Amino acid sequence: MHNDLKEVLLTEEDIQNICKELGAQLTKDYQGKPLVCVGILKGSAMFMSDLIKRIDTHLSIDFMDVSSYHGGTESTGEVQIIKDLGSSIENKDVLIIEDILETGTTLKSITELLQSRKVNSLEIVTLLDKPNRRKADIEAKYVGKKIPDEFVVGYGLDYRELYRNLPYIGTLKPEVYSN
């Protein structure tokens, strides 16, 4: 599995430092507010778990499972909601927790849906951002790290459901995903 990687972009320590920094900022920004953290499954599960431990304010969590990849390395642009939220977010401050922001088409669809539910506020935190890939008019307020336009795996990010369990983030060798 490790031999399939070209290089490591973020070590375990790098990721934990990012979580600490983002957690401190989110604690400051959401102190005393009715915060609901919405994790986008499956990719954000590890990031969300580490991040919310560092947000020192009352919060609740919920999840959405949304897909626009359908097994490949490129977003199809067609967003399918597999699992919607389990509770109401009306009059709450909502923080979408995402693993990676690339084209933005999936996140744009999610934000439009959630904004229609009469939230107080809606922001996005993403561990990774690939601004060069953006197609939709959307940005994350909180960004862990901007990365180059390479296919990354690990720490929740997958290729065909594999590599999610890596404790770091790396780039796959092109021959692994071009077959």
Swiss-Prot record:
InterPro entries (alphabetical): HGPRT, Hxn_phspho_trans, PRibTrfase_dom, PRTase-like
Residues that, per the record, bind diphosphate: 42-43, 164
GO cellular component: a single term: cytosol
Required cofactor names: Mg(2+)
Sequence positions that bind Mg(2+): 98-99
Principal EC category: transferase
Molecular function terms, GO-annotated: guanine phosphoribosyltransferase activity; hypoxanthine phosphoribosyltransferase activity; magnesium ion binding; nucleotide binding
Keyword Transport applies: no
Keywords from the named record: Cytoplasm, Glycosyltransferase, Magnesium, Metal-binding, Nucleotide-binding, Purine salvage, Transferase
GO biological process: GMP salvage; guanine salvage; hypoxanthine metabolic process; IMP salvage; purine ribonucleoside salvage
Superkingdom as given in the UniProt entry: Bacteria
Pathway(s) annotated for this protein in UniProt: Purine metabolism; IMP biosynthesis via salvage pathway; IMP from hypoxanthine: step 1/1; Purine metabolism; GMP biosynthesis via salvage pathway; GMP from guanine: step 1/1
Reaction(s) this enzyme catalyzes, per UniProt: IMP + diphosphate = hypoxanthine + 5-phospho-alpha-D-ribose 1-diphosphate; GMP + diphosphate = guanine + 5-phospho-alpha-D-ribose 1-diphosphate
Active site: 102 (proton acceptor)
Compartments reported by the entry: Cytoplasm
Its EC number(s): 2.4.2.8
Binding site for GMP: 130, 151-152, 158
Its job: Purine salvage pathway enzyme that catalyzes the transfer of the ribosyl-5-phosphate group from 5-phospho-alpha-D-ribose 1-diphosphate (PRPP) to the N9 position of the 6-oxopurines hypoxanthine and guanine to form the corresponding ribonucleotides IMP (inosine 5'-monophosphate) and GMP (guanosine 5'-monophosphate), with the release of PPi.
Similarity-based family: Belongs to the purine/pyrimidine phosphoribosyltransferase family.
Name recorded for this polypeptide: Hypoxanthine-guanine phosphoribosyltransferase
